[in-house]
C-alpha cells in the first residue's frame, strides 16, 4: 500500500506520486533486427525477485528513474535517474 | 436491571451515567464503559444471532477479536454495521441495533435453520444448489444472502469527514500494554522519536484489567502515569483508538485512528477517522496474546465468555459476569480469575481443570473438579448449566456464566503481512512470528513471553537495544517491582474434548463447528487453505482471530500430525476491518477528482454555454439562444454561421507544450512520424505521433516560433500522456539531445476564429498584416494586439475547413480578448460555438479525432501513408510500422458513410455489413467512428473504419446496431463531405 521510492532528486516519496512504465529495457537501434524490436515492444520477463523498471516521478521532479525492486518483497534496492544511466551506457 | 454492576472496582466513573438504547430499549451505562460492558451491566446476555444457524449469541471477548457481539451503531448516514460492541465506547445517546434477526432478536424465524443443520454442514451449498443452474442467481443466492449475513450498509451518504496523514519515527511501538509502555518509555526517555499506537481508548492494554501492583502502584495507575509521562515528551506521540492494521514494504505501517467514533455528534472541524501511514525506522510489535477458546458442545451459548474477558469486565468495568459463574481452564490463569471474582464478592460455583494438578495453590470457595472437561452447556437464550465430564461420567452443574481459559496465542498478524509464515513452537504450544524480520521486532505476549514482570522487562530491554542501534545514548533502564497473583500460563493445548453432543463451535462468526472440520478432512480438504475455504472457518470480519489455531489443531489431530505440519493460512492486511471512509479520505463528492476549467470558462458561461464534462475538463458544448427548443437547433445555427460568417470557439484545453533547445527540431523529427527538421520558422505543421508498436498515439499541430523554439499542441485527452512520453523520449531514449520541455497548457487561453469573415474580424485587434499574402495558410507567429498592448501567438490552422485562425493569449486575458473579438465581429455575425459544432464541422471535413485514432490504426489507414517519412533514419514507431499486418490491403480504412434515405439516421458504434450479409462476427466490415447531422449535406453523415474502405467508395452497405435493433441501408463515400479541394482554407 505504501511503499516509498527513494527519488535521487526529491528523496523518499510515496509511490502515488509516480507512474510506472514497465521493464527498463534499452531501445534497439533503428535498423536492428525485427526480432529485437519484437522483444523490445512485446516480450517481458516476469521474474520472481529483482526487476528493473522505468518509473516517472510524475507528481514530483518529472524525471524518469530506473527503479530496481524486488517483485516479491517490493523492497527497492536502487533508484537512479534514467538519463544518467542511458548516457553512461551509451559511452560503453 | 443494572444489578450486575459492582459497587466498587474498575475505571468507570459511577458519577457519570450515560443513557443509550439497544434495539430501542433504553439502558444506562457509565463513562468509561464499552457498549459490551454496559450491556452486561444491564444483564443483557443475548446480543446477536449467529451467521448461519441464527443461534443466540452473547459477548465472548472484551476486545478486537469479538466474533459474536456485532451490532449496528448510529442511524442514517452514520449507521455503522458490524461494529464490535466490545470496541465501541459508550456515549450519551448511543443507539445500537442487533443484526441478522427477524422479526426480533428474541424471536428469530431464522433460528429454524438450526433444525436444518444436518443439511447445512461445510460445503452444503456446493453440493445442494447445483441444479437447476438458472435458479442459483434467481433463487438460491438471494435467499441464502438474506438468511445468512451480518449487518446492512446504510444507503445514505456519510455526512462525516475523513483524512489521511503521514508520520515518521525512529521507533513505532504497536500496542500500549505492559511491553509497549515499557518500550516507549525507554526509547522516549532516550530521546528517540517514538510513536505509540493502541487500539483501545486508554493506554495500558492488559494492565487496565490487572490487579497486580507495579512499584507499589495499581497496574492501571502505573499505565496512566506512564502514558502521562510519554505524552509530556515532545519526541513521543501517543495515538489511542488507533489500530495498526498492516505492515508494508519500506517499513511503512498502515493505521486507522478512530478520532470521533466515541462521540454522539462529531465536531465538524475534525475527521471521524484518520488513516495513518507511519514510516518507522524500527517497529516493535507488542500486541500481546489472544486467549484461545475451548471447543465443547454449546460453547457459543450467551454467558460463555473468555476468561480474560471476564477479568476485564470485572476489573476494568466493574461488571459481574453473573452470580453463579464457573471456570473451565487448562492452565493456572483460571485460578487468578477465580480469586478476583471472589474478592469482588462473586462466588465461583466450580473450577473445571483439564489437568490432574494445578500449578497454584488455590484456597478459595469454589469446587475444584480436576482432570475434567466441560463437554456441554444447557440453556435457551443464556446459559443455565454446564455438563462436566470427568471420571467417565457426566455431571450437570447449574451456572449462569462460564469462563473458558484455553491458553494463549501470540497476536502476530502484522509480523506475517510481508510473506513470512508463522512458526509452530511445540515448547510454547503456539504459533510464533517468523524469525529474522527486517525492521520489526516482536516482544512480550506477542512473543509468547508470559508474566507481567517479564513483559515489562522485555519491552524495556528491546527498546534499549534499538536506541543503541540508532546511536543514541540510553539512560539505565529502571527495574520495576511487580506484585502479581497471576498464575503461569500452561502451554498444553486441549484440542478435543470427550462427550460432546451439541454443536461445538470452532469459528463462532461463521458457525463452523467441530463436525465441519472433520467433514472437510474426510472429504479431502485437509490442506489448511482448502479447509478454510470449504468450511469458511477463519473468514469474515474477524478473520479467525479466535478460531484459526483451534481449527489447525483439530485438523492436525484428525490427520495425526503436528500443527507445524498443517501450518497456517496466509495473514493479510487488514488486521481488523477498516472503513471505506478512512481509505477514501477526503476524496469524496466534489473532491473526488479535480475540475479543470478553461480560462474562457466564465466567458462561455456568460454567453449561456451548456457545458459537458470531458475527462476533468468542462467544455462549452453549445450556446443556446432564445427560441431554440433542442440542442440540434442551436448546433445547426452555429454550424451554418461558421460556414457563412464566423464563429469563436474555446480550444484552450488542447494540450500545449513548449519545446526548446538546440536539438528541438531533431527531437520533434524523432517523436513525429512525419518530417519536422526543416519546418521553417513561422510555420505550423500537422504531426502524427506513433507508439513504438507503429500505431498512432496522438496528433496535433506544432509550430516553429523561433529556430530553437516550438509550440506543440496535443489532443485534450492525451495532453498529460504526451508530456510524459516526450519526457521519456528526451530523458531515456535520447538524453544526448539538447531539448527542454515545458507544459504550457494552463498558461494560454486559446480560441479558434473560423469562417469566411474571420480575417476581417481578427485584423481589427491584430497589429500585423494578416492578409493571405502576409499570413498564409499554416503561418504561425507571435503577434501584437491593440497597438502593442498585448502579445499573443497566432496560428493559421483550421479544423473546420474554413478560413480560420487560432489565437493564444496569456490565460488571464482570455475573457477580455474573446469579448473584444465578439465586439469586433458584431457587425459580421460572429457567434460563439461549442464542441458539438466543432465536431460537426470536422466530420464534414473528414478530420479525425481519437474516435478514429483508436489505438489500432496506422497512418495509412487514415490516408496519411504518404506523410510518414521514408527518409528519416529513426522515429518512434518506424521499425514496427513495417510489419506485414500493418500494411495489409484489408486493413480498416477511413471512409465516409451516408444513409441512402436522407430521412434515416444511424449512430456511432454501429457496424458496417456488406449488402445482404448476415449480422455475424465474420461478416463485420468495420464500424462507424463518428456521426453527426450535417446541415450542409442535409442528412446524417459519418466517418467509419471499414475493411479496404478506400477502394469501396460508392458501395451500398448496411449500417447495423444490434444493441439498438437498428439497420440502415447506406453508402460508403469519400470521407470529406465539404470543400474537398480545400479552397476555403486558402482564401
Curated annotation (Swiss-Prot), chain A:
Its EC number is 1.5.3.24. It is found in: Cytoplasm. The keyword Isomerase does not apply. It comes from the Bacteria. It is an enzyme of class 1 (oxidoreductase). Its main location: cytoplasm. Keywords: Cytoplasm, Metal-binding, Oxidoreductase, Zinc. It holds the Pfam family SoxD. GO terms for cellular component: cytoplasm. GO terms for biological process: tetrahydrofolate metabolic process. Zn(2+) binds at residues 7, 10, 57, 61. GO terms for molecular function: metal ion binding; sarcosine oxidase activity. It catalyses: sarcosine + (6S)-5,6,7,8-tetrahydrofolate + O2 = (6R)-5,10-methylene-5,6,7,8-tetrahydrofolate + glycine + H2O2; sarcosine + O2 + H2O = formaldehyde + glycine + H2O2. The keyword Cell cycle does not apply. Heterotetramer composed of subunits alpha (SoxA), beta (SoxB), gamma (SoxG) and delta (SoxD). Belongs to the SoxD family. NCBIfam families: soxD. In the presence of tetrahydrofolate, catalyzes the oxidative demethylation of sarcosine to yield glycine, 5,10-methylenetetrahydrofolate and hydrogen peroxide. In the absence of tetrahydrofolate, catalyzes the oxidative demethylation of sarcosine to yield glycine, formaldehyde and hydrogen peroxide. This is Sarcosine oxidase subunit delta. It comes from Rhizobium meliloti (strain 1021) (Ensifer meliloti). The lineage of its organism: Bacteria, Pseudomonadati, Pseudomonadota, Alphaproteobacteria, Hyphomicrobiales. The gene is soxD.
From Swiss-Prot, chain B:
The keyword Cytoplasm applies. It comes from Rhizobium meliloti (strain 1021). The lineage of its organism: Bacteria, Pseudomonadati, Pseudomonadota, Alphaproteobacteria, Hyphomicrobiales. This is Sarcosine oxidase subunit alpha. NCBIfam families: soxA. Its EC number is 1.5.3.24. GO terms for cellular component: cytoplasm. It is found in: Cytoplasm. Its main location: cytoplasm. Gene3D superfamilies: 2Fe-2S iron-sulphur cluster binding domain, sarcosine oxidase, alpha subunit, N-terminal domain, FAD/NAD(P)-binding domain, Probable tRNA modification gtpase trme, domain 1.
Amino acid at each position: 500500500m505504501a511503499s516509498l521510492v527513494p527519488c535521487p532528486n526529491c528523496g523518499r516519496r510515496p509511490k502515488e506520486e509516480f507512474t510506472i512504465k514497465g521493464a527498463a529495457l534499452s531501445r534497439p537501434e533503428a535498423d536492428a533486427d525485427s526480432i529485437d524490436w519484437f522483444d523490445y515492444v512485446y516480450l517481458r520477463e516476469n521474474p520472481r525477485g529483482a526487476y528493473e523498471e522505468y518509473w516517472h516521478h510524475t507528481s514530483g521532479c518529472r524525471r524518469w528513474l530506473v527503479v530496481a525492486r524486488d517483485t516479491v518483497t517490493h523492497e527497492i534496492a536502487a533508484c537512479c535517474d534514467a538519463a544518467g544511466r542511458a548516457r553512461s551506457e551509451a559511452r560503453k | 436491571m443494572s444489578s450486575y454492576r459492582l459497587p466498587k472496582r474498575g475505571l468507570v466513573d459511577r458519577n457519570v451515567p450515560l443513557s443509550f438504547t439497544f434495539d430501542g430499549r433504553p439502558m444506562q451505562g457509565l463513562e468509561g464503559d464499552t457498549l459490551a460492558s454496559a450491556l452486561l451491566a444491564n444483564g443483557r446476555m443475548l446480543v446477536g444471532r449467529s451467521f448461519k444457524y441464527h443461534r443466540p449469541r452473547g459477548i465472548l471477548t472484551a476486545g478486537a477479536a469479538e466474533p459474536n457481539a456485532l451490532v449496528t451503531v448510529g442511524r442514517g448516514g452514520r449507521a455503522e454495521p458490524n461494529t464490535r460492541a466490545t470496541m465501541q465506547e459508550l456515549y450519551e445517546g448511543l443507539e445500537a441495533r442487533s443484526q441478522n434477526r427477524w422479526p426480533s432478536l428474541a424471536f428469530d424465524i431464522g433460528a429454524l435453520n438450526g433444525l436444518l443443520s444436518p443439511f447445512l454442514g461445510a460445503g452444503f451449498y456446493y453440493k445442494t444448489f447445483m441444479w437447476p443452474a438458472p435458479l442459483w442467481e434467481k433463487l438460491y443466492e438471494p435467499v441464502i444472502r438474506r438468511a445468512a449475513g451480518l449487518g446492512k450498509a446504510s444507503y445514505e451518504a456519510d455526512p462525516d469527514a475523513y483524512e489521511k496523514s503521514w508520520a515518521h519515527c525512529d521507533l513505532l511501538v504497536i500496542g500500549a500494554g505492559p511491553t509497549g509502555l515499557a518500550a516507549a518509555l525507554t526509547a522516549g526517555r532516550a530521546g528517540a522519536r517514538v510513536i505509540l499506537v493502541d487500539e483501545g481508548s486508554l493506554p495500558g492494554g492488559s494492565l487496565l484489567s490487572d490487579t497486580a501492583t507495579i512499584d507499589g502502584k495499581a497496574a492501571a495507575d502505573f499505565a496512566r502515569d506512564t502514558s502521562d509521562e510519554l505524552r509530556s515528551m515532545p519526541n513521543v506521540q501517543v495515538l489511542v483508538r488507533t489500530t495498526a492494521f498492516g505492515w508494508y514494504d519500506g517499513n511503512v505501517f498502515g493505521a486507522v485512528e478512530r478520532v470521533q467514533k466515541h462521540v454522539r455528534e462529531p465536531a465538524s472541524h475534525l475527521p471521524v477517522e484518520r488513516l495513518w501511514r507511519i514510516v518507522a525506522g524500527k517497529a516493535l510489535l507488542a500486541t500481546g496474546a489472544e486467549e484461545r477458546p475451548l471447543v465443547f458442545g454449546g460453547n457459543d451459548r450467551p454467558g460463555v465468555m473468555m476468561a480474560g474477558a471476564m477479568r476485564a469486565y470485572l476489573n476494568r468495568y466493574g461488571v459481574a459476569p453473573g452470580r453463579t459463574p464457573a471456570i473451565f481452564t487448562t492452565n493456572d490463569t483460571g485460578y487468578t480469575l477465580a480469586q478476583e471474582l471472589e474478592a469482588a464478592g462473586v462466588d465461583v460455583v466450580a473450577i473445571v481443570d483439564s489437568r490432574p494438578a494445578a500449578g497454584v495453590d488455590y484456597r478459595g470457595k469454589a469446587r475444584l473438579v480436576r482432570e475434567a472437561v466441560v463437554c456441554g452447556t444447557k440453556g435457551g437464550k443464556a446459559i443455565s448449566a454446564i455438563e462436566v465430564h470427568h471420571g467417565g461420567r457426566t455431571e450437570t452443574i447449574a451456572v449462569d456464566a462460564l469462563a473458558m481459559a484455553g491458553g494463549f496465542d501470540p497476536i502476530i498478524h502484522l509480523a506475517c503481512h510481508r510473506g513470512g509464515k508463522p512458526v509452530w513452537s511445540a515448547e510454547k504450544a503456539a504459533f510464533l512470528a517468523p524469525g529474522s524480520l527486517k525492521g520489526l521486532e516482536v516482544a512480550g505476549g506477542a512473543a509468547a513471553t508470559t508474566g507481567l514482570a517479564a513483559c515489562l522487562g522485555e519491552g524495556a530491554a528491546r527498546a534499549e537495544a534499538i536506541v543503541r542501534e540508532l546511536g543514541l545514548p540510553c539512560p539505565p533502564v529502571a527495574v520495576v517491582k511487580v506484585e502479581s497473583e497471576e498464575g503461569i500460563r500452561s502451554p498444553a493445548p486441549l484440542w478435543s474434548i470427550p462427550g460432546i453432543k451439541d454443536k461445538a463451535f470452532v469459528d463462532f462468526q461463521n458457525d463452523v463447528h467441530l463436525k465441519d472440520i472433520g467433514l472437510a478432512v474426510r472429504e479431502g480438504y485437509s490442506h489448511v487453505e482448502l479447509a478454510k475455504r470449504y468450511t469458511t472457518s477463519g473468514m469474515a470480519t474477524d478473520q479467525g482471530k479466535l478460531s484459526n489455531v483451534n481449527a489447525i489443531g483439530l485438523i492436525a489431530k484428525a490427520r495425526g500430525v503436528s500443527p507445524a505440519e498443517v501450518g497456517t493460512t496466509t495473514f493479510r492486511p487488514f488486521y481488523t476491518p477498516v472503513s471505506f471512509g478512512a481509505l477514501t479520505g477526503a476524496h469524496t463528492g466534489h473532491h473526488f477528482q479535480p475540475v479543470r476549467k478553461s480560462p474562457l470558462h466564465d466567458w462561455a458561461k456568460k454567453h449561456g454555454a451548456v457545458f459537458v464534462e470531458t475527462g476533468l475538463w468542462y467544455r462549452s458544448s453549445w450556446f443556446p439562444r432564445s427560441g431554440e427548443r433542442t440542442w440540434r437547433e442551436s448546433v445547426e445555427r452555429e454550424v451554418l454561421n461558421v460556414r457563412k460568417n464566423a464563429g469563436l470557439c474555446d480550444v484552450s484545453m488542447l494540450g500545449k507544450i513548449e519545446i526548446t533547445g538546440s536539438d528541438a527540431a531533431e527531437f520533434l523529427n524523432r517523436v513525429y512520424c512525419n518530417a519536422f527538421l526543416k519546418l521553417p520558422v513561422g510555420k505550423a505543421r500537422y504531426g502524427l505521433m506513433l507508439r513504438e508498436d507503429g500505431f498512432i498515439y496522438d496528433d496535433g499541430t506544432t509550430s516553429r516560433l523561433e529556430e530553437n523554439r516550438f509550440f506543440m499542441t496535443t489532443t485534450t485527452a492525451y495532453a498529460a500522456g504526451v508530456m510524459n512520453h516526450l519526457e521519456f523520449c528526451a530523458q531515456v531514449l535520447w538524453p544526448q539531445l539538447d531539448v527542454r520541455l515545458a507544459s504550457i497548457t494552463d498558461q494560454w487561453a486559446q480560441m479558434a476564429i473560423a469562417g469566411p469573415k474571420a480575417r476581417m474580424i481578427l485584423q481589427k485587434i491584430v497589429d500585423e498584416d494578416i492578409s493571405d499574402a502576409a499570413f498564409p495558410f499554416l503561418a504561425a507567429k507571435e503577434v501584437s494586439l491593440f497597438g502593442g498592448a498585448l502579445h499573443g501567438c497566432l496560428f493559421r490552422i483550421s479544423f473546420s475547413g474554413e478560413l480560420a485562425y487560432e489565437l493564444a493569449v496569456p490565460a488571464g486575458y482570455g475573457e477580455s480578448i474573446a469579448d473584444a473579438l465578439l465586439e469586433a465581429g458584431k457587425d459580421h455575425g460572429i457567434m460563439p460555438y461549442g464542441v458539438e459544432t466543432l465536431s460537426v464541422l470536422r466530420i464534414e471535413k473528414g478530420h479525425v479525432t481519437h474516435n478514429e485514432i483508436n489505438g489500432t490504426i496506422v497512418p495509412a489507414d487514415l490516408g496519411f501513408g504518404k506523410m510518414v517519412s521514408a527518409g528519416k533514419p529513426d522515429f518512434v514507431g518506424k521499425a514496427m510500422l513495417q510489419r506485414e499486418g500493418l500494411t495489409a490491403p484489408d486493413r480498416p480504412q477511413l471512409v465516409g458513410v451516408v444513409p441512402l434515405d436522407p430521412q434515416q439516421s444511424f449512430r456511432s458504434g454501429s457496424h458496417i455489413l456488406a449488402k445482404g450479409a448476415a449480422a455475424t462476427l465474420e461478416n463485420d466490415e468495420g464500424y462507424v467512428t463518428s456521426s453527426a447531422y450535417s446541415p450542409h449535406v442535409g442528412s446524417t453523415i459519418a466517418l467509419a473504419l471499414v475493411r479496404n474502405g478506400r477502394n469501396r467508395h460508392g458501395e451500398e452497405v448496411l449500417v447495423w446496431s444490434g444493441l439498438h435493433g437498428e439497420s440502415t441501408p447506406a453508402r460508403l463515400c469519400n470521407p470529406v463531405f465539404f470543400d474537398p479541394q480545400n479552397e476555403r482554407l486558402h482564401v
